[in-house]
Amino acid sequence: MAVEPSGKLIVFSAPSGAGKTTIATMVLQRIANLSFSVSATTRKQREGEQDGVNYYFLDKATFEKKIEQGGFIEHEFFFGNYYGTLLDATESVLASGKNLLLDVDVKGALNVRKLFGERSLLIFIQPPSMEVLIERLQGRGSEDDAALQERLERARFEMSFADQFDTIIVNNNLTAAVDDVEAAIVNFIG
């Protein structure tokens, strides 16, 4: 008989440029019993990255086999590579009593809700406006016009799902957004 996991899942979704990664990093420093979920990917390992720390690096055939076997909570194909959250790694962390923070797209977040129900808290990080989002993405200087337009289309798509999340945090002020996210998580995990 399986032991019921005691940890909970906190799921972050946001359009690129909304500040999700920054908020997640700050919240992880503030909440002791919260770990960051390590995703699996088929992208090439970059210098300085460690397997099992930054990502679980899998080849395409292994990743696709795990998809067929139901080995992912969620997965997506994005910019030529697979990314996903491994079911066994997630269950292992939850069974240890730790809470887990996942950074996934909106469809992945909704799938987490289907699988984990009330043991999951879905938080959507939203930019104050599309204009601010455009400024943030342009400020990165890492996107050409075509890539920027693609990210903006994806942002509009992702923002259309925000009302299906438990909490929407508008990142107009980083300190306030981090405080609001922390309060929502602490309230949820007890």
Curated annotation (Swiss-Prot):
Pfam families, per this entry?
Guanylate_kin
Q: Which residues form the Guanylate kinase-like domain?
A: 7-186
Q: Which reaction does it catalyse?
A: GMP + ATP = GDP + ADP
Enzyme kind, highest EC tier: transferase
Q: Which UniProt keywords apply?
A: ATP-binding, Cytoplasm, Kinase, Nucleotide-binding, Transferase
Entry's PROSITE patterns? Answer: GUANYLATE_KINASE_1, GUANYLATE_KINASE_2
E.C. numbers? 2.7.4.8
Q: Where, in this chain's numbering, is ATP bound?
A: 14-21
Task: Provide the Gene Ontology terms for cellular component.
Answer: cytosol
Single Gene Ontology MF annotation: guanylate kinase activity
The answer, when asked if Disulfide bond is one of the entry's keywords, is: no
**Could you tell me where this protein is found in the cell?**
Cytoplasm
* Taxonomy, superkingdom: Bacteria
Q: What does this protein do?
A: Essential for recycling GMP and indirectly, cGMP.
Q: Which HAMAP family match?
A: Guanylate_kinase
Give the family this protein belongs to, as stated in its UniProt record: Belongs to the guanylate kinase family.
UniProt name for this protein: Guanylate kinase
Naturally occurring in which organism (per UniProt)? Chlorobium chlorochromatii (strain CaD3)
Organism lineage reads as: Bacteria, Pseudomonadati, Chlorobiota, Chlorobiia, Chlorobiales
